[in-house]
Amino acid sequence: MPTIQQLIHSAREKITNKTKSPALKACPQRRGVCTRVYTTTPKKPNSALRKVARIRLTTGFEVTAYIPGVGHTLQEHSVVLVRGGRVKDLPGVRYHIVRGTLDTAGVKGRLKSRSKYGVKKPKKK
């Protein structure tokens, strides 16, 4: 507990929160261009081939982003929209690609949780 004299000498320091997605520069999403699309393996208890892409953002950052959903058509030079959100079992992957925007198509044949994967409502027969 500081004395009043100590508080007069120097005020209390504000606690600043460190952002978990610095490359977005305080924006909800950012546009970027894929420089490399590849698969990588997750951390220890899990086993899979996770689809990720290296992306150069409009902010100038080069980040690794996860491609959610089953199947994708992304390749080098594809323009994508990137949002924050890490993938727990992939170290260094702190961003997600938004499906159904720009060059990223929605997940084919998806009927549940469609809004998360950029799929339009199916036509009623």
Swiss-Prot record:
InterPro entries: NA-bd_OB-fold, Ribosomal_uS12, Ribosomal_uS12_bac. GO terms for biological process: translation. GO terms for molecular function: rRNA binding; structural constituent of ribosome. Belongs to the universal ribosomal protein uS12 family. Part of the 30S ribosomal subunit. With S4 and S5 plays an important role in translational accuracy. Located at the interface of the 30S and 50S subunits. This is Small ribosomal subunit protein uS12c. The gene is rps12.
